[in-house]
A protein has these predicted regions:
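N-terminal accessory/pre-domain segments preceding catalytic cores
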Residues: 1-158
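Intrinsically disordered, low-complexity segments enriched in polar/charged residues with Gly/Pro
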Residues: 55-57, 182, 226-228
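Generic preference for flexible, low-structure residues
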Residues: 73-75, 115-119, 183, 187, ...
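Secondary-structure boundary elements
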Residues: 134-199, 210-212, 249, 258, ...
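Hydrophobic/aromatic-rich core segments of domains that either
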Residues: 206-270
Length: 270
């Protein structure tokens, strides 16, 4: 996973009639600027921009599997951590407070040992910021085709709600559910927005990630939510989108299936 060295990438100049349209917003990208760094045992944790809702981690290559463990008193998240020189980006989606960030190395099977860790006090500049930047689960940069596609679809829209509606309808109509992939998807699978865009096929995780990429690229906070849908008790991925001061539930996979928001039980948010 590549990371950008620039925090904001400016878009093309707004058209002459921009006063009638939604103003252009910068593309927010993560930066490992080296201002606040924790290092040890071959691990580097860059916490320079925790106020923006993310932390960046890299680790020297290891023959053993590596995990990033990011926790508060409220919840714990585990992520795969590729070894190498490039940073991986992880969200600080649990809000303000003390985070424990650890890199864990596999001992055997599901047993992991601490390789290095740090405690980081987080104060977000805005509570929606973790859902405006790319991270390991919702990855993109200025060269991602889905970002350009979102720009085209958002052209002429007069509000975030209009943009969200256009992007949602695009994902719903462009994507078809891949039952073969659903039956064989490996543990630890991560979506690829451009692969989903190119194939027009995917599982619920692909739908939700593609929509989140396109929305975040337009400066609209978007979550990928993973949990269960009742009454079927189906493990599923969907979205929540921040519009007009509140989080709005969206499910591009099920679309008009008859489910209500109250049917959805959240496990994890990215």
């Amino acid at each position: 996973m590549a990371s950008s060295n620039t925090q904001e990438t400016e878009r093309a100049a707004a058209p002459a009639n921009a006063d009638e349209q939604q103003p252009e917003k910068p593309l927010l990208l993560p930066e490992a600027s080296g201002i606040v760094v924790f290092e040890g045992e071959g691990v580097t944790i860059d916490a320079s921009h925790t106020d923006q809702g993310y932390v960046m981690i890299r680790c020297e290559p290891s023959e053993k599997r590596l995990k990033a463990r990011i926790a508060t008193d409220a919840q714990t998240y585990y992520y795969d951590l590729p070894g190498g020189e490039q940073y991986s980006v992880y969200p600080l989606q649990m809000g303000d407070g003390l985070y424990t960030v650890r890199v864990m190395e596999q001992v055997e099977n599901d047993l992991y040992a601490l390789r290095y860790g740090a405690e980081i006090q987080v104060k977000l500049a805005a509570e929606t910021l973790p859902f405006l930047y790319p991270n390991q689960y919702v990855w993109y940069d200025e060269n991602t085709r889905a970002v350009g596609q979102a720009d085209e679809l958002a052209s002429g829209a007069k509000s975030d709600r209009e943009i969200a509606r256009a992007l949602y309808r695009f994902v719903v109509t462009h994507m078809s559910y891949d039952t073969d992939k659903a039956a064989t998807v490996p543990n630890g699978y991560l979506p690829d927005a451009d692969a989903s865009l190119a194939s027009g096929k995917g599982i619920c995780f692909d739908y939700a990630e593609l929509l989140a990429v396109m929305l975040r690229a337009q400066g609209i906070p978007a979550q990928v939510v993973i949990g269960n849908v009742m009454p079927e008790n189906v493990y599923h991925a969907w979205n929540r989108v921040f519009l007009e001061g509140e989080w709005v539930w969206m499910d591009p996979t099920f679309d008009r299936s008859g489910h209500r928001e109250s049917d959805y039980i959240t496990d994890r948010i990215y």
